[in-house]
Amino acid sequence: MASTVMSSLSLKPTFTLEKTSVKGLPSLARSSSSFKVVASGVKKLKTDKPYGINGSMALRDGVDASGRKPKGKGVYQYVDKYGANVDGYSPIYNTDEWSPSGDVYVGGTTGLAIWAVTLVGILAGGALLVYNTSALAQ
């Protein structure tokens, strides 16, 4: 009797899942469409001269520090190809973008008060955390 029961059992699972679609629910099945990533073009900076300190080479007697005449083969030969920032000097501000009223804080007194209250709150919160985790709180 045990042998007939064992022979009727299959060792391989025969679990099958039928695909059913429910109206209004999105399908979780993967589509066979291909995924392609395309990089955008290089953004060139348009400025009159490169940002770095050596944007224009003004050498005494027409020679560099080692006594050689420049051939124009430095990084600045690529200014027209890659844009002005070819020397790796990347300022966080540009004098052309400065505010004309840069000597006055735009936020005014209210902005300074909000900034001060935020700073005091952060410092007080840190002090409270230190106090609560120390032996003084017990």
Swiss-Prot record:
InterPro entries: PSII_PsbR (IPR006814)
Provenance organism: Solanum tuberosum
Entry keyword set: Chloroplast, Membrane, Photosynthesis, Photosystem II, Plastid, Thylakoid, Transit peptide
Gene Ontology CC terms, in alphabetical order: chloroplast thylakoid membrane; photosystem II oxygen evolving complex
Chief site of localization: plastid
Name the UniProt record assigns to this protein: Photosystem II 10 kDa polypeptide, chloroplastic
Pfam families, per database record: PsbR (PF04725)
Lineage, uppermost ranks: Eukaryota, Viridiplantae, Streptophyta, Embryophyta, Tracheophyta
Organelle targeting sequence: 1-39
Induction text: By light.
Function: Associated with the oxygen-evolving complex of photosystem II.
UniProt-annotated location(s): Plastid, Chloroplast thylakoid membrane
GO biological process, one term: photosynthesis
Similarity remark: Belongs to the psbR family.
